[in-house]
């Protein structure tokens, strides 16, 4: 660069030139390469959720990666061996759809985007060890995804079955339950999800439901919100399974309930429309009616079927069951709100004590039998609606008069002894559906042989490589079904002709173990080494968005536990600490009547905004940055104008990391001004220490002590803030110490000044690595600041021998003086009475009483 640090004066700091220089130097020196010769006690694994390579960073990315980078830099200076890697979650529909649109291969599109985004990440000054880079769509990575699938298959944790699945009609692929939003739409395309029956591959996540639920208690460094979301998704229910005999049949129906205390109130049963017993029980006269009913309810999403507000649809099966508790006959219905995949596919209808059952019973005029009443005898208002609270048993034979909670245990014991009930635990969690009918994904390493059935591709034959020369249309069956030369192969067992599996895996399969591959990404023999995993895992700090609370984070927890069961690793949880950073928001201009968004340039009068098309009032609110809302801010534009350090400082300072951040250009300007102020302060202070004429200036010992006190307070506060991930208050402390030191530097000794600016630059470096590196060299150092140790806090330096003594007259503050801390109460009284403030306000009067609060105040009562 033109101006080396040896000839810089107090000119303005030019970030673009300095940042480009140091980024090149860091890369050339391989400064951030991980030291692999480590022991577990001294490792720190700092990890951001890796991005999908869309081709451009957005401010949400910037916030995520800068947070992790600050922590990585800080921990290095604290003496830890830090692993701070980056990679690319590069399989998936967006690349395939982009390739179809542009008539290029997904790999070409992906490689180009990765190159662009890597340059953008480097411009942020991130301390990434690029030697650890992984890309999930590369053969050297997905070979091991296939290997992991094989291990799961060997251990009966991967299987195929015919299932009713969520079908995205736009993307032409299957979605897991977690990928369908609250409105029954695809999480990616937004299409209304349909139901379809297909042969699908599943991973047996339900085998780990109890461990996934129980071990949430270990994750006390995760946000409570995330743990609650996972707990609700796993959905553990403790209750009983009740067996109902069918009248005039040998068949039986089992139903799960958490409210066995209401069993005497069961007045009907409801089956899912695809319950296996229905076709055996229904009269031939009702088959057409049944088919019509099934077609109607198949159009509903699971969420719609479970909704409390929608009217439930049902159909009487024409067959009755026997309530085992009281031997009463009860009708068997089919209901659209019962889902076969949940529980047993049958529910007992207790309309008196369940809101959904009450609505259903009212719609079809079914009996409503109350078996629990409120504790207040005279209160009969409960008879006008469902009563869902605890109470006293009624109409329940020998259990009448007992509290319902106590009756649960007694009725379960009675039912168990009579062989119609047994204790049962169920989970809402369903097995993970990983089949996808698309091209750009990891091939499932299974070969279908007519003789041998499903056969795993041998580990030494992996990877099953995606064919390159393939025509993508985005319509119909999986593109792989068109590659007959790829499909046709030989059975690994018997050698006869066989066919490859044409489904690819859910991209979450690749992203649920990538944090393990980072440890040894160049290992050609194994996906990872157990001994190395033991050193680095679990990840000490994971940073990513709350939107991954159920999908990625739950799948990663499951796969970690599954790999432990397979004997591949020793850990059972992947991430020790989790930070879910808030969204980055910016101002939007929206017509609330049409929901149409406008850019700022389209609004003529910002103070009185109107829709440029209709003249209606415009709503100005902060929303998540988005191209469609015209409120996105390109990180490259900000870096070009202000530099990466300013962008980093703003993104860290504007809000606590877990809160949403509102973008404000004026606040960015404010951070830029602080960067300039920091630059000038350090440069000018350094020049002071080299100014021979200062030898004639009288130094004040108290100013040296004050400077050391200020810098040590900053060390303590910033260290505590970094340990607690409170980056905004850490930067606030930086600003405070610069302001405080600026007032006294002219009166401090050179020794103190050199010490203070050295510490200041060090504690600045995690936040603003470029300017810190430049300043570090400017003040005479040769080794990178990012290889220095974090300064130690000196508690003695912040202790003061004096304090500000407040002088009160009749309880009102009238002045203050500096006083020594070791003065007695009598000395403080004498000192206070002789002050100008006391003499003025006492006006010759004798004090009636003097109250002394040590090290704080003297109150003179007159």
UniProtKB/Swiss-Prot annotation:
Annotated keywords: Aminoacyl-tRNA synthetase, ATP-binding, Cytoplasm, Ligase, Nucleotide-binding, Protein biosynthesis
* InterPro entries, alphabetized: aa-tRNA-synth_I_CS, aa-tRNA-synth_Ia, Leu-tRNA-ligase, Leu_tRNA-synth_edit, M/V/L/I-tRNA-synth_anticd-bd, Methionyl/Leucyl_tRNA_Synth, Rossmann-like_a/b/a_fold, tRNAsynth_Ia_anticodon-bd
Q: Where in the cell is it found?
A: Cytoplasm
Q: What is this protein called?
A: Leucine--tRNA ligase
Q: Where is this motif: 'HIGH' region?
A: 51-61
Which reaction equations make up its catalytic activity? tRNA(Leu) + L-leucine + ATP = L-leucyl-tRNA(Leu) + AMP + diphosphate
Could you say which protein family the record assigns here?
Answer: Belongs to the class-I aminoacyl-tRNA synthetase family.
The record's annotation in PROSITE patterns points to: AA_TRNA_LIGASE_I
Quote the NCBIfam families the UniProt record gives: leuS_bact
Q: Where does ATP bind?
A: 627
- Record flagged with keyword Aminoacyl-tRNA synthetase: yes
Q: Name one GO cellular component term.
A: cytosol
Main location (coarse class): cytoplasm
Set out the biological process GO terms recorded for this chain's protein.
leucyl-tRNA aminoacylation
- According to the UniProt entry, what is the EC number of this protein? 6.1.1.4
State the span of motif ('KMSKS' region). 624-628
What's an example of a GO molecular-function annotation for this chain?
aminoacyl-tRNA deacylase activity
């Amino acid at each position: 660069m033109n101006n080396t640090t040896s000839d810089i004066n107090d000119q303005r700091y030019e970030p673009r030139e300095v940042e480009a220089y140091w980024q090149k130097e860091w890369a050339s020196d391989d400064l951030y390469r991980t030291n692999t010769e480590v022991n577990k006690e001294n490792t720190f694994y700092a990890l951001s959720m890796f991005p999908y390579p869309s081709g451009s960073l957005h401010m949400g990315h910037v916030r995520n990666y800068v947070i992790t980078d600050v922590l990585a830099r800080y921990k290095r200076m604290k003496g830890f061996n830090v692993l701070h890697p980056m990679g690319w979650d590069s399989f998936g529909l967006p690349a395939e759809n982009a390739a179809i649109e542009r008539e290029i291969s997904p790999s070409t599109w992906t490689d180009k985007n990765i190159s662009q985004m890597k340059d953008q990440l480097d411009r942020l000054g991130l301390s990434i060890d690029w030697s650890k880079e992984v890309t999930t769509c590369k053969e050297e990575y997905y070979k091991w995804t296939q290997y992991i699938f094989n291990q799961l298959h060997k251990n009966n944790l991967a299987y195929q079955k015919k299932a009713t699945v969520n079908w995205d009609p736009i993307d032409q692929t299957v979605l897991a339950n977690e990928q369908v939003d609250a409105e029954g739409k695809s999480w990616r395309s937004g299409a209304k999800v349909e139901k379809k029956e297909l042969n699908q591959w599943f991973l047996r996540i339900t085998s780990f439901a109890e461990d996934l639920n129980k071990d949430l208690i270990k994750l006390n460094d995760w946000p409570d919100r995330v743990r609650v979301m996972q707990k609700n998704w796993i959905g553990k229910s403790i209750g009983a399974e009740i067996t109902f005999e069918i009248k005039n049949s040998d068949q039986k129906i089992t139903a799960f309930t958490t409210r066995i205390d209401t069993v005497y109130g069961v007045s009907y049963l409801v089956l899912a429309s695809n319950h296996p017993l229905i076709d055996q029980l229904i009269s031939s006269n009702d088959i057409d009616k049944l088919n019509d009913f099934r077609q109607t309810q198949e159009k509903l999403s699971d969420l719609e079927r479970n909704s409390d507000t929608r009217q439930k649809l049902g159909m009487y099966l024409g067959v009755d069951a026997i309530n085992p508790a009281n031997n009463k006959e009860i009708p068997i219905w089919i209901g659209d709100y019962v889902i076969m995949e949940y529980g047993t596919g049958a529910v007992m209808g207790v309309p008196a004590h369940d809101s959904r059952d009450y609505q259903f019973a009212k719609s079809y005029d079914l009996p409503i039998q109350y078996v629990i009443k409120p504790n207040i005898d005279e209160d009969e208002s409960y008879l006008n609606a469902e009563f869902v609270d605890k109470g006293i048993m009624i109409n329940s034979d020998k259990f009448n008069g007992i509290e319902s909670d106590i009756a649960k245990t007694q009725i379960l014991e009675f039912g168990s002894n009579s062989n119609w009930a047994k204790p049962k635990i169920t989970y809402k969690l369903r097995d993970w559906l990983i089949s996808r009918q698309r091209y750009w994904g990891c091939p499932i390493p299974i070969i279908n042989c007519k003789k041998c059935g499903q056969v795993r591709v041998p580990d030494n034959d992996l990877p099953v490589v995606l064919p390159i020369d393939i025509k993508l249309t985005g319509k119909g069956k999986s593109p792989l079904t068109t590659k007959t030369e790829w499909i046709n192969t030989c059975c690994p067992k018997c050698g006869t002709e066989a066919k490859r599996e044409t489904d690819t895996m859910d991209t979450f399969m690749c992203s649920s173990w990538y944090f393990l591959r980072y440890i040894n990404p160049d290992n050609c023999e194994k996906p990872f080494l157990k001994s190395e995993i033991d050193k680095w895992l679990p990840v000490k700090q994971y940073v990513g968005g709350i939107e991954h609370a159920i999908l990625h984070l739950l799948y990663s927890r499951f796969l970690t536990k599954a790999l432990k069961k397979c004997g591949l690793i020793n850990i059972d949880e992947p991430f020790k600490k989790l930070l879910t950073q808030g969204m980055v928001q910016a101002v939007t201009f929206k017509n609330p009547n049409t929901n149409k968004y406008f850019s700022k340039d389209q609004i003529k009068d910002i103070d009185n905004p109107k829709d440029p098309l209709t003249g209606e009032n415009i709503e100005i609110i902060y929303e998540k940055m988005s191209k469609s809302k015209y409120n996105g801010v390109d990180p490259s534009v900000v870096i070009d104008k202000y530099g990466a350090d300013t962008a980093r400082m703003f993104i860290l300072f504007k809000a606590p990391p877990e809160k949403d951040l509102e973008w404000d250009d004026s606040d960015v300007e404010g951070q830029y001004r602080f960067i300039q102020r920091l630059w000038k302060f350090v440069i000018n202070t350094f020049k002071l220490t080299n100014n021979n004429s200062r030898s004639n200036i009288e130094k004040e010992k108290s100013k040296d002590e004050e400077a050391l006190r200020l810098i040590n307070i900053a060390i303590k506060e910033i260290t505590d803030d970094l340990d607690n991930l409170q980056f905004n208050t850490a930067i606030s402390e930086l600003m405070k110490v610069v302001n405080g030191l600026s007032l006294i530097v002219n009166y401090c000794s050179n020794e103190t000044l050199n010490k203070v600016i050295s510490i200041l630059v060090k504690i600045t470096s995690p936040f603003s690595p470029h300017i810190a590196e430049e300043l570090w060299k400017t003040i005479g150092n040769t080794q990178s600041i990012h290889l220095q140790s974090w300064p130690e806090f000196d508690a003695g330096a912040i202790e003061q021998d004096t304090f500000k003594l407040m002088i009160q007259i009749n309880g009102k503050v009238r002045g203050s003086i500096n006083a020594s801390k070791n003065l007695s109460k009598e000395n403080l009284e004498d000192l206070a009475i002789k002050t100008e403030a006391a003499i003025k306000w006492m006006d010759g009067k004798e004090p009636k009483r003097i109250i002394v609060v040590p090290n704080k105040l003297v109150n003179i009562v007159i």
